[in-house]
């Protein structure tokens, strides 16, 4: 089983028990998310390819007392939305978990815009 699939399986189990969990995604093409999206339409939010806005939505949900998991490709989640992550989840110490796929050169075939060699360094600084 892929790590991603194991993670989604655990999120599904958690959502069965706790409706204060929200799963936000910028990855609309991931078939692995189909079952989660169908079973929990009120707790699964597809934010489109707009990672910065997705982090702002996550901040709002967390401020209302929810636990939020944010899922996207590493270069866009760690780098494009760095300011939102810092000011939302980081400075306010909110229960937002960032889950990324394609770390390092995981999507190297998509070109340099999809490289994520500095994602850990940026995220750890927060």
Language-model-derived ranges and their functions:
Residues 1-126:
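Thiamine diphosphate
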């Amino acid at each position: 089983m892929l790590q991603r699939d194991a993670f989604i399986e655990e999120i599904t189990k958690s959502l069965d028990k706790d409706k204060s969990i929200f799963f936000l995604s910028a990855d609309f093409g991931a078939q692995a998310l189909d079952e989660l999206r169908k079973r929990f339409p009120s707790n699964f939010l597809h934010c489109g390819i707009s990672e910065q806005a997705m982090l702002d939505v996550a901040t709002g949900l967390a401020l209302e007392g929810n636990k939020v998991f944010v899922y996207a490709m590493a270069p866009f989640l760690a780098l494009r939305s760095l300011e939102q992550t810092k000011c939302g989840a980081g400075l306010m110490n909110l229960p937002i978990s960032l889950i990324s796929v394609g770390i390092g050169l995981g999507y190297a075939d998509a070109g340099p815009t999809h490289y994520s060699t500095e994602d850990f360094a940026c995220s750890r600084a927060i």
